[in-house]
Amino acid sequence: MPYTAEAFQNEFLALGATEVNAIVTVTSSGAEGGRRTSGATEIIIVDASGSMQAEGRINAARQAAKAAVECIDDGVNFAIIAGVSTAQQLFPAPGQLAVSSPQSRSDAIRSIDRLQASGGTAMGAWLLLAAQLFGQRPGDIAHAILLTDGDNGERAGYLEQVLDSIAGRFTCDCRGVGVNWKVSELRKIAQAMLGTVDIVAQPSGLTAAFEQMMVKAMGKTAADVQLKVWTPVNATVRFVKQVEPEVMDLTGKRIEDGPRAGRYPLGSWGAESRDYHICVDVPAGAAGDEMLAARVSVVEGDTVHAQSLVRAVWTEDTALSTKINRQVAHYTGQAELAEAIQAGIEARKAGDDRTATIKFGRAAQLAHASGNKATEELLATVVDIEDAATGTVRLRRKVEAADEMALDTRSTKTVRVGRAQ
C-alpha cells in the first residue's frame, strides 16, 4: 500500500528559539486493486432505549441499520448490537460474528425487524460487547457505528473506564439523532476511538448517514497505521495533532518505541490524505547551527512505508526566521477556530453573553480568513455575522438546539490550504 509523507515548515529559527513546527501530509493511494491487506469486521450498535420510540426514531434506525448492512462487502465479518440498559446482540447468535453474504445480510435484515425500543442507555456496556466481538478477529480492520438519542445512564466514570480499556482496538463513528443527547459524551467516545461524531437532526436523515459511514468503512484497506516520531537527544515532542480533515489531538495516545521514539495511532486507512501538526522542543543553537529536529515515519508494525524530516536552522536573518510557514499558520488558526467555537458554546450555556460574543466573533473571523465556508455558515445559525473580517457578531436571541449541536459537533472539521508558500 504506497504512502508518501511530506513536511511543510519554515526551518529557520531566530537565535534563542527552541520551538520547531511542521505540517506533515500523509497520503495513501490505497492497496493495489482496492484489496484489503487484512480481514475486516463491522459492528452496528443501535440505541434501542425507550426514548427511541419518539418521533419515529426506532423505525428510522431500523431502516438505517438495514441500509448499512446492505453496504457490507462479501466476506466481511459483522454483528448488530441492540443497545439498552445492557448490550444485547441482535445478530448473529450471541458471542458470534457472521460472514457477510447475500444470505447472511438477508438474515440480518430480518433480525433488525425485531428491534424494539425499551429500556435505558448504557454506552459503556455496548462498547464493551463490541470490543469482545472484535477480539475474535485480531488484526482485522475493525470499525463500529454507534447511534444514540440520549444521555448515558451508567454510573459516573464507567464509560471513561471502558474507553481506557478498549482504546485502540477499533474505530468508532458516533451519531446522535435528535437533540436530547450530549455532544461532549459522543465526542469523548469518538476521540478515544479515533472516530467521528455528528448530529442527525431528523430521523429521516439516518439512512443516508449510515450508508455514508459504511461505504467509507468499506474503502479502508489497512488496519493499523501509525506515525512514528523520532527525536534526537535533548529534543522532545510537545504535541502531535491531526489537523485535516478534522482536529484530533494524538499527543496523549503516544506509545513509546525505543529510547527516543514514540508511535501515534492513525487508525485504518484507504486511499486518502491527512495532515498532522508536529511540534518539537529543541535546545537553542548558535547562528548557522543546523539539526534534525524529528524524523517522522508512516509505519505498520515493523514496515516503514514513508518518511519525512523536520529540520531546524538558526539564523540572525530576521527576514528568514520571522516568516511563518503558510501550512503551519493555517492549521494553527483552524485549531484555534475549533477551540473558540467550543468556548463560545460553553459561555452561551453559562449565560456569559459577553464571552460568547467575543469567542464567536473570533471564530467568525478565523473561518472567514481561512475560507472555511461550511463553519462560517454553521456560525451564522447561532450568531448574526455583521462583519466576518473584523469578527463583529451579535448573539441570536433564539437558537435552535439542533443548529447549536451541529456547530459544536462540526467545529473540529477543517479545510485544507494550498501548498504554495
Label the predicted regions.
Residues A82, L227-A235, P245:
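Short acidic, flexible loop segments centered on an aromatic residue
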Residues Q9, V26-G30, A48, T231-V233, ...:
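Beta-strand elements of well-folded, non-transmembrane domains
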Residues V282-Q421:
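Long, acidic serine/threonine- and proline-rich intrinsically disordered regions
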Residues T4-D224, P283-G285, A369:
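Exposed acidic/Ser/Thr-rich ligand/metal-binding surfaces
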Residues Y3, V20-A22, E42, V225-L227, ...:
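Hydrophobic residues positioned within well-ordered beta-strands of beta-sheet architectures
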Residues V247-A271:
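Extracellular adhesion/glycan-binding regions together with long Ser/Thr-
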Residues L90, Q96-A98, D275, D289-R295, ...:
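Local beta-strand/beta-hairpin segments that build beta-sheet-rich folds
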